From Swiss-Prot:
NCBIfam families: nadA, PRK09375.2-4. This is Quinolinate synthase. HAMAP family: NadA_type3. It comes from Haloarcula marismortui (strain ATCC 43049 / DSM 3752 / JCM 8966 / VKM B-1809) (Halobacterium marismortui). Disulfide bonds: none annotated. Its cofactor is [4Fe-4S] cluster. Catalyzes the condensation of iminoaspartate with dihydroxyacetone phosphate to form quinolinate. InterPro entries: NadA, NadA_sf, Quinolinate_synth_A_type3. Pathway: Cofactor biosynthesis; NAD(+) biosynthesis; quinolinate from iminoaspartate: step 1/1. Its main location: cytoplasm.
């Protein structure tokens, strides 16, 4: 494997031109902040819609018009007539909303620092270099790229250009089936665990290999293309934390517990759980549970806390107890930022607007449309 000099060109904060929180907003107390947010929302009325991701803290979710996963929220944005879409999520989510909303709608991400680390693990420079190596190593076979929704718009656009598509954690298996109808091999980005779990679900567990763009001694391209599924070395830091011993401990403490985990978890964790599914699946499973049932949740801790509040008759417990993590990127959407961007809109000023370049936007839409077709 060859490695390129990425260090000077890569940045976790893709939108590092966005503005920071003004000093006057940094020390707002909770009561004043809530009052100011509600006042601004009352003045803006139907001109604004707030989207709250399942992983957001309660102080954001309580002001949200819609709560859900990233793709659900993007669809809600597209169906809204609001001029301003405030996304309580991370950068790639705001990009996805901008891709599918009308051009006259503005998508606002309150904090520039809400950048998903996993999305940043597969940047265009790295993917272009890997693609050149992999395709050069192929003879007559074709490789189809699939990117998880948790990726930047430029990666979605790349996949469209190369005949690939986008997937969610719910339809990744369908994306794989589509890709193997069109080609011979799959490059799955950026989450290796979702890719591996999907390959395992389709009976391809022994046909995968990892591709690490940072490892000069890693898999050679000629060796990589001997496998049907090439998994990009990316992962969610929250979900990778879960281990089998967490499930073993839960089963000791709660013998009748139902263990449900996100498919971004390691394969051995997914196999040891009772159910694996998207955040929507997790929410639906708890909502449909009988009173008194115990559900151990293997995902970001704020969703577990929401489920505890929403379903007090169900015993909802975090899979790894106090060791369960919140998403650091989601944490950057501080409610003080929400107060700031709302009050700026009241004054006629748009702050921290996420705009995907037109050509990139058009191609990314193609990749997302292919997903909808399956």
């Amino acid at each position: 494997m060859e490695t390129a000099a990425f260090e000077t060109d890569l940045s976790l904060f893709k939108y590092d031109n966005l503005e920071q929180l003004p000093p006057s907003y940094r020390d707002l107390d909770a009561d004043e902040r809530t009052e100011r947010i509600e006042s601004a929302l009352a003045e803006l009325g139907d001109d604004v819609v707030i989207l709250g991701h399942n992983y957001q803290r309660q102080e954001i979710v309580e002001h949200a018009d819609f709560i859900g996963d990233s793709y659900q929220l993007s669809k809600e944005a597209a169906q809204s007539d609001a001029d301003y879409v405030i996304f309580g999520g991370v950068t790639f989510m705001a990009e996805s909303a901008d891709i599918i909303t009308d051009d006259d709608q503005s998508v606002i991400l309150p904090s520039m620092e809400a950048s998903c680390p996993m999305a940043g693990m597969a940047e265009a420079l790295q993917v272009d270099a890997a693609w050149a190596e992999l395709t050069a190593a192929l003879d007559d076979e074709e490789i189809i790229p699939i990117t998880y929704m948790n990726s930047y718009a430029d990666l979605k656009a790349f996949c469209a250009e190369q005949g690939g598509l986008v997937c969610t954690s719910s339809n990744a298996h369908k994306a794989f089936e589509y890709a193997f109808e069109k080609g011979d091999k799959v490059l799955f980005l950026p989450d290796k665990h979702l890719g591996e779990n999907t390959a395992h679900r389709l009976g391809m567990a022994d046909e995968t290999v990892e591709w690490d763009p940072w490892d000069a001694e890693g898999t050679d391209a000629a060796d990589a293309v001997e496998n049907d599924v090439i998994l990009w070395e990316g992962y969610c830091q929250v979900h990778e934390r879960f281990r089998e011993h967490h499930i073993e401990s839960i089963r000791e403490d709660y013998p009748d517990a139902n263990v449900i985990v996100h498919p971004e978890c390691r394969r051995e964790v997914v196999e040891a759980a009772d159910v694996a599914g998207s955040t929507s699946t997790i929410c639906e499973s708890v909502a449909e549970a009988d009173p008194g049932e115990t559900w151990a949740i293997g995902t970001e801790i704020h969703l577990t806390h929401h489920l505890q509040r929403w379903h007090p008759d169900v015993n909802v417990v975090p899979l790894c107890g106090d060791a369960c993590m919140d998403c650091n990127a989601m944490r950057q959407i501080d409610p003080n930022y929400l107060a700031w961007v709302l009050e700026e809109l009241v004054e006629g000023r748009e702050r921290n607007v996420i705009e995907v370049a037109p050509e990139e936007k058009e191609l990314a839409q193609v990749a997302m449309d292919r997903m909808l077709e399956i």
